[in-house]
Amino acid sequence: METKLTTVGVIGGGQLAWMMAQEAPRLGLKLAVQTPGESDPAVALADKVVLTAIADGEGTRELAEHCGVITFENEFVDLPSLEKLAQQGITFHPRLDALAPLLDKWEQRHFLQNLGLPVPDFWALESLPAQLPDFPWVLKARRHGYDGQGTQIINSPADLPDLSKAPPGSWMVESFVPYERELAVIGVRNARGEMEIYPVVETKQIDQVCRWVVAPAPIDAAIAATAQDYCRRILNHLDYVGILAIEFFLLPASTQTPTPEQRLLVNELAPRTHNSGHFSLDACHTSQFALQLQAVTGQTLGSSALRCGQAVMVNLLGYEVSTGDYQQQLDKLAALPHSHVHWYGKGDCRPGRKLGHVTLLNPDVESEPSTAWAEDLVKQVEAIWYPD
């Protein structure tokens, strides 16, 4: 088989593509990446690198010369440029018409509503109702927001930033959801309609950045089943090929929210691998990165099932401006029982930047999911990683 047919192109070269590049050889595949920086993590492992901006259509055309299919590490792409390339026979997975309703958060919310899935109340910033919704609000950039960037909690009119120079249609407002937990689920589908759905996980955010993830989430089985069902519905409706992550709000149980369907709100979709799925590298039979590659190349999908009782993934976030390698801390983390450390090799550290992660496993497959178990390990990891 020609090398081009066994090479997957990835738009993006960060840590998600880096982890894909680690999995590719095990599947008999090569990886080519389109990324702007020579020091981006995936550059060191990719078989071919196109150094250009993520949204550069000509760069994507060059990428396509080296691969049989192109997939995505992030959603910061220029869809019209890609559509021109698709018309010339370049294959993208997910397909561009499946991506189209997901890239803009406003359009994504309407897509979910039309599918009959519950979402928080939301409005375009330019068309707020005459009777303003109660504070607090969540102000969101409709595109290019991630890790808390492009999201702001608005507690009063005084908190509103000056957006007078913002292009129309670039911001939206939604009601703040007083949730009990934040959950996530990742699903994968290939062109034959075969699917794998990972266990539902709980995510812990601090300052709107994910700090840790516990899998499976310690929640009622009916709630987990509902979240996974929503994932299947979205994948099938879009005739999706690739990987999709869904973030949820779980509302507190009450007389107003007695059923799983009433307690779950869909927050956001991400048409790519996701931070909430990093645990799968060490805790599942097949990682999210391997499943994405299998799906977009038409391979049989591996199992997404856990091969341990429980796992907790802790992000290693930057807390200073530095170029250090943090080897002493990494060695201590690696010495923790059933620990797996992943260091992304980024050239510089700054506060809040995701530099790596560590996953810790409970090998007892008969154990019940426990928040206390996860929180104890998170404390151990963060005591090692962060200075006093």
Swiss-Prot record:
Native organism taxonomy: Bacteria, Bacillati, Cyanobacteriota, Cyanophyceae, Synechococcales
Annotated HAMAP family: PurK
Function, as annotated: Catalyzes the ATP-dependent conversion of 5-aminoimidazole ribonucleotide (AIR) and HCO(3)(-) to N5-carboxyaminoimidazole ribonucleotide (N5-CAIR).
Catalytic activities: 5-amino-1-(5-phospho-beta-D-ribosyl)imidazole + hydrogencarbonate + ATP = 5-carboxyamino-1-(5-phospho-D-ribosyl)imidazole + ADP + phosphate + 2 H(+)
Subunit structure: Homodimer.
PANTHER family named among the record's database cross-references: FORMATE-DEPENDENT PHOSPHORIBOSYLGLYCINAMIDE FORMYLTRANSFERASE (PTHR43055:SF1)
Domain ATP-grasp residue range list: 109-297
GO biological process: 'de novo' IMP biosynthetic process
Keyword 4Fe-4S listed: no
Recorded superkingdom: Bacteria
Full protein name: N5-carboxyaminoimidazole ribonucleotide synthase
MF terms (GO), sorted A to Z: 5-(carboxyamino)imidazole ribonucleotide synthase activity; ATP binding; metal ion binding; phosphoribosylaminoimidazole carboxylase activity
GO cellular component terms, semicolon-separated: cytosol
Species name: Synechocystis sp. (strain ATCC 27184 / PCC 6803 / Kazusa)
